[in-house]
Amino acid sequence: ALNREIDLSVAFRKFAITSMAPRLHKFPLFINTHPKETFSKPFFASLTALRRQTPEIQLVVEIHESAVTDLLRLRELSAFLRDIGVRFAYDDFGAGQARLNELGEAPAHFVKFDMGLLHDIHLASERKRQVISDLVKLVLNLGSVPLAEGIELEEEAQICRDMGFHLIQGHLTGRPIPADRL
């Protein structure tokens, strides 16, 4: 079952990248990885092949926090991605372990804050807002771009901007649509 999930992940990633290549222009394409494939040789090979096929695309690989269990392997992944011209993002930051050690040792280009932290942030206590704001400042000081996930309301977006988020993602900015309608 796991191999099937990984095979599907590879197939969907290839389809997404090749179908989006003509539509992206200067915009980056964020792609998810299956936590079990992130450090595998087949993943490295498939990503290398996709880079050769579509060198014009600005790819960003999202690394889920559950995939990060070994700092040495993470550094190797970071070096590999850099060598093939792919940036990476820590996905779902704050959903479980904060991964502060990894932020310092293997800095990502983007840090995607989990939607669970930011849902109804406009209604949250000042203390919660301060914690998130301090984390955003830390991410910025480490040279990464903070991205707020799951933003649905303008009030949430404004609080996120005030906290220093550079990017937002969620239904406020657009709902999922078929690629051919982009």
Regions found by a protein language model. Give the residues of each.
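A short, well-structured catalytic beta-strand-centered motif of the EAL phosphodiesterase domain
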Residues: 1
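Catalytic core of bacterial c-di-GMP phosphodiesterases, primarily the EAL and HD-GYP domains
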Residues: 5-75, 150
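A general structural detector for well-ordered alpha-helical segments in enzyme core domains, enriched
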Residues: 16-19, 43-50, 70-81, 99-102, ...
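A structural signal for short coil/turn segments at secondary-structure junctions
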Residues: 23-24, 54-55, 81, 85, ...
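EAL-family c-di-GMP phosphodiesterase catalytic domain
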Residues: 34-37, 62-69, 87-182
